[in-house]
From Swiss-Prot:
The HXXXXD motif is essential for acyltransferase activity and may constitute the binding site for the phosphate moiety of the glycerol-3-phosphate. It holds the Pfam family Acyltransferase. One of its GO terms (cellular component) is endomembrane system. SMART domains: PlsC (SM00563). Transmembrane segments: none annotated. A motif (HXXXXD motif) lies at residues 112-117. It is an enzyme of class 2 (transferase). This is 2-acyl-1-lysophosphatidylinositol acyltransferase. PANTHER family: 1-ACYLGLYCEROL-3-PHOSPHATE ACYLTRANSFERASE-RELATED, LYSOCARDIOLIPIN ACYLTRANSFERASE 1. It comes from Saccharomyces cerevisiae (strain ATCC 204508 / S288c). It is found in: Lipid droplet.
Length: 397
């Protein structure tokens, strides 16, 4: 018994320590690869983008692998048959992991509970072989993080200051780039915008589709709530709800509509689907906050993690979303979040998003990635650690 306690304590220290070391080494290696691709292919945008996309895919492989080791959660994905065809997510018995057939050009929106939500959303795209095509809208301050900030800028993530007057041009040009390249009519196809406004906004022709060029997919991830759920943000959300004359929700924060509406408008020529995702974590009660239970320190250093991550997905055709009228869109989004709040209410009551096998499809497995890519991204950091351990052993003995 004492043996087991000691082994457990050692594991809680050694595994997170080695995992974090591998993570930082992996990030440095990916950063080196980014610099290599940018240098070697500085005059070949397509080859450079292919190389950078490879490092982006390997980054989610790296992060997912670390998370799978320190927090081996199971994942249960539930989809609504009415909007997401049954079998879109499935367990591949040969590859022994969850795969999917998500649309190539899409936007994913989700409630925001803990800091690692984005990893699961990125992993969902990865199951459809879109891990290299994920784009995330983030706070501008994150771009200044040493090493990671540089890497994220190379991934063309979109950084927002939360001041719409400043963010509009940044968001417009980033989204226009995604849209035009998805149609084979953007800068990666050697094309130029029709014009550039005095404010610096690039205007592209939304009707041009070039079948001879590469069409670059995108999966844009947004959190309309703007921040994760906490006592402080709940209070701020309630004040915001009172300001706009809306009833605050019980289980989610009030969403902001401006950025999402603008994104859907700019991507309209190429977007195929809007995925509405709701995440629930086992071990978090209705009156509790996920960020306090499953914070970064708790997950990566203390070994506290949800045993089961529940993900509910439904899809919307952008043609059915009222994008032209701002008030109508705000009402539509409020309705979507009201349904999300009710979904979370059911989750807290039953512990699942599954309601009826006739209307829902569900698949459950552990949080896995491609073994070949896993080897590819971990081999150098692992060999480095083995070398360091060997040197330490030689020094001591």
């Amino acid at each position: 018994m004492l043996h087991q306690k000691i082994a457990h304590k050692v594991r809680k220290v050694v595994v997170p320590g080695i995992s974090l070391l591998i993570f930082f080494q992996g990030c440095l290696i990916l950063l080196f690869l980014q610099l290599t691709y940018k240098t070697l292919y500085c005059r070949n945008d397509i080859r450079k983008q292919i190389g950078l996309n490879k490092t982006k895919r390997l980054f989610i492989v790296l992060v997912s692998s670390i998370l799978h080791v320190v927090a081996p959660s199971a994942v249960r994905i539930t989809t609504e048959n009415s909007s997401v065809p049954k079998g879109t997510f499935f367990l591949d018995l040969k590859k022994k992991r969850i795969l999917s057939h998500l649309k190539s050009n899409s936007v994913a929106i989700c409630n925001h509970q803990i800091y690692t939500d984005w990893i699961f959303l990125w992993w969902l795209a990865y199951t459809s072989n879109l891990g290299a095509n994920v784009f995330i809208i983030l706070k501008k301050s994150l771009a200044s993080i040493p090493i990671l900030g540089f890497g994220m800028r190379n991934y063309n993530f979109i950084f927002m200051s939360r001041k719409w007057a400043q963010d509009k041009i940044t968001l417009s040009n980033s989204l226009a780039g995604l849209d035009s390249n998805a149609r084979g009519a953007g800068s990666l196809a050697g094309k130029s915008p029709e014009r550039i406004t005095e404010e610096g906004e690039s205007i592209w022709n939304p009707e041009v589709i070039d079948p001879k060029q590469i069409h670059w997919p995108y999966n844009l991830i947004l959190f309309p709530e703007g921040t994760n759920l906490s006592a402080d943000t709940r209070q701020k959300s309630a004040k915001y709800a009172a300001k706009i004359g809306k009833k605050p929700f019980k289980n989610v924060l009030l969403p902001h509509s401006t950025g999402l509406r603008y994104s859907l408008q700019k991507l309209k020529p190429s977007i195929e689907s809007l995925y509405d995702i709701t995440i629930g974590y086992s071990g978090v009660k209705q009156e509790e906050y996920g960020e306090l239970i499953y914070g970064l320190k708790s997950i990566f250093l203390e070994g506290k993690y949800p045993k089961l991550v529940d993900i509910h997905i439904r899809a919307f055709d952008v043609k059915d979303i009222p994008l032209e009228d701002e008030n109508e869109f705000s009402e539509w989004l409020y309705k979507i979040w009201s349904e999300k709040d009710a979904l979370m209410e059911r989750y807290y009551s039953t512990g699942s998003f599954v309601s009826d096998p006739e209307t829902n499809h569900s698949v459950t497995d552990s949080f896995k990635i491609n073994r070949i890519e896993l080897t590819e991204v971990l081999i150098l950091p692992t060999l480095t650690i083995i070398w360091l351990v060997y040197k330490l052993y030689c020094f001591i003995f």
